[in-house]
């Protein structure tokens, strides 16, 4: 059973006074349903679970009066074998985007405040304009992502104490013993090749069979393509899929990882395809890393909406866009050139995205300085360079020297920990999970 960090959020939610309904957001197949079901099993006596895709007739419960008493009575007739007791029963409405009246009902569950209600579903189908009264102010949100590297380590049997020991080297900025470092790099390469989609991770834990992993990844990708075909407007269907499938080429097959419309279609232009990128973003199928024209806080003030990199929301999906041999090269550490640098940059971006950071990158055509990724942490800008080899980070060194308000920067490498006098903290790639 895969342990997820989202469970801790849910436990805190249970103990919140005057708690609201909880909406679990996130892309498809990231473990939302599984996590809620396991949470209910461990914390409640009873679970009322309605999946509106599997049980469309259950929408009738929400077709009349939306008083809590009326809805509970409808559930009791629908599930006579279940007990619905305040505080002891969790009501879980899954695939809620299929039932707009159920979305509206969240306000009344929250006002009544007797029953614990969690809802989940893809963002794709929720048409806010069709919901007669979207429950603004009556819901809390939990964003779920694919499995991150620390969760992957838990699944591989690495205990919390072992991870705490590893983090001790990070805090003290001392070299990780080679036996530990080498094994961690092996785990990290496995994680990159597998990605964080729970089905793929569980299959690897059970079988260690990369052919099976590949099959699952491709099936997941087909599911995302189906969602584009099912939910996108007629105008966006083909364009959005073209943009999505181009991501592997954008990120791995060229040195410049900026999203270029010409890679989507010969002669492609922003005027034609930008709305498709916006649709993919709203659908939780991509996340963006925007160019900034300055390295000062607040980076968002200097961000350009028209100049960005677009990443898949999990590495599993990126792997599915490439040949099986890429996974072999990653695990065996035999990648070279643009693919190696691109893969590591994607892995670092993936980790930061799953931590909830907005991502930026910097490039100055005049000075030729460029920074792979920039985030804001504890009120300061943190520049990050990703090196496929242990090469110099001249741009990072220059930025730190010229900006006193940027106290440090990270250089992530296929190597061990090191600290320089110029504020550059060199870390192994896997340490991105723990900063």
Report residues per predicted region.
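Interdomain motor-coupling "hinge/lid" segment immediately C-terminal to the ATP-binding subdomain
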Residues: 129-252
């Amino acid at each position: 059973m895969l342990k997820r960090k989202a469970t801790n959020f849910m436990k805190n939610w249970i103990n919140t006074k005057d708690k609201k309904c909880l909406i679990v957001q996130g892309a498809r197949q990231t473990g939302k349903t599984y996590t809620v079901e396991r949470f209910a099993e461990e914390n409640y006596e009873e679970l009322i679970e309605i999946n509106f895709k599997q049980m469309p007739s259950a929408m009738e419960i929400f077709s009349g009066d939306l008083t809590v008493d009326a809805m509970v009575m409808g559930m009791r007739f629908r599930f006579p074998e279940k007990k619905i007791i305040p505080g002891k029963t969790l009501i879980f409405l899954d695939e809620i985007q299929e039932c707009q009246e159920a979305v509206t009902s969240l306000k009344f569950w929250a006002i009544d405040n007797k029953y614990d209600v969690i809802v989940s579903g893809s963002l794709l189908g929720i048409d806010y304009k069709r919901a007669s009264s979207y429950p603004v102010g009556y819901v809390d949100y939990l964003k779920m992502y694919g499995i991150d590297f620390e969760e992957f380590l838990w699944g591989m049997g690495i205990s919390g104490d072992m991870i705490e020991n590893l983090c001790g080297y990070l805090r003290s900025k001392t070299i990780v013993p080679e036996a530990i470092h080498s094994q961690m790099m092996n785990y990290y390469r496995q994680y990159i090749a597998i990605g964080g989609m729970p089905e793929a991770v569980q299959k690897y834990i059970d079988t260690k069979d990369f052919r099976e992993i590949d099959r699952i990844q491709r099936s997941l990708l087909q599911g995302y393509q189906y969602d584009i075909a099912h939910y996108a407007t007629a105008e966006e269907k083909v364009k959005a899929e073209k943009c999505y499938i181009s991501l592997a080429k954008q990120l791995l097959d060229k040195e410049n990882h900026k999203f270029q419309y010409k890679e989507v279609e010969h002669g492609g232009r922003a005027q034609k395809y930008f709305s498709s990128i916006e649709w993919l973003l709203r659908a939780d199928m991509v996340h963006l890393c925007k160019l900034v024209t300055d390295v000062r806080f607040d980076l968002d003030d200097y961000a350009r909406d028209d100049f960005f990199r677009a990443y898949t929301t999990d590495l599993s999906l990126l792997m599915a866009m490439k040949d099986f041999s890429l996974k072999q090269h990653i695990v065996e550490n035999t990648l070279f050139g643009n693919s190696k640098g691109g893969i590591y940059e994607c892995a670092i971006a993936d980790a930061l995205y799953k931590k909830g950071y907005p991502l930026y990158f910097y490039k100055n055509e005049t000075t030729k300085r460029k920074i792979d990724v920039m985030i804001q942490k504890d009120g300061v800008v943190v520049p990050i360079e990703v090196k496929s080899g242990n090469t110099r980070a001249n741009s990072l060194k220059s930025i730190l020297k010229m900006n006193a308000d940027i106290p440090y920067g990270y250089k992530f490498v296929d190597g061990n920990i090191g600290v320089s006098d110029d504020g550059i903290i060199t870390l192994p790639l896997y340490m991105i999970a723990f900063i």
